[in-house]
Amino acid sequence: MSETVWAVDGSFFAQRLSGIQRYSIELLAALDRIVPPGFVEIVTPPGVETPHYTNIKVVSFGTHRGGVWQQLDYPRYLRQHGAGGLATCNVIPLFGFRGIAVVHDVCYRARPDFYTDPRGRLSAAWHCLQYRRIAKRAERIITVSEFSKSEIAKYYGVPASKMDVVYNAWQQMQRIAPDESIFARHPQLKPGQYYFNMANLLKNKNFPWVLRAAGAKPDAVFAIAGGGSLAAEAERLGLADLPNVLYLGYVSDGAAKALMAHCKAFLFPTLYEGFGIPPLEAAACGAPQIIVSDTPCMR
């Protein structure tokens, strides 16, 4: 039997980087600085690239990928090695899991009105099943804010004594060099004269508010970064013909840092978050103003 005590679900390394994946990466980097060799392993599907660690060993295991790997191969590894699991991305194996799980938020349970189309309802059903399973099976739950901790207790009856808060961080922004070339590529953006928002089509991100704000301030430039069909969504909302809105598409971390540093204000009109990393990152980058919604998670 292996001497490994904890085996981390490393399947997130194969996913596109977002707040949850960023949290997981930074958490493991911090763990690597304090754990003894052999105490923690990261288990990944085959062919997944990971950072280099000093004290944490990375193990490629199994034959599947994605959700199937999480549900079949990962718990098989835990059983074979007698290790506790550490799952950092809201999902655990439905069977065969013993250990610690990170729940970033319970948005699917708290705001079902955000998930009304067939795909959204299916996703909500899966995540709510996961929330219930984590509440029942995890030995401890980590979450990212006192607000999220209170929501887990409210909806799933998890006692506070079973939960710990490990906050999101901003320090990763210090390691990113700002990419000032974004301004040469978009000469409409003058430092200190534009509002900046990092958007997506998730309803909690409240993208329509940004467009309405742009419509109310026709003399101001609104720079919107983010992948997906943001322009198509603006057209669906009847807000596509706003000449002061500039869609930047997906931007690199370096470009985002430069845009945050030189904006007039960073906009984060969220309707629900477990933590909400972007305002903290914007503050770390020197954004002179940060405008957030008046919702409990932002207070």
Task: Please place each PLM-identified region on the residue numbering.
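Carbohydrate transferase catalytic cores enriched for Leloir-type hexosyltransferases
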Residues: M1-R299
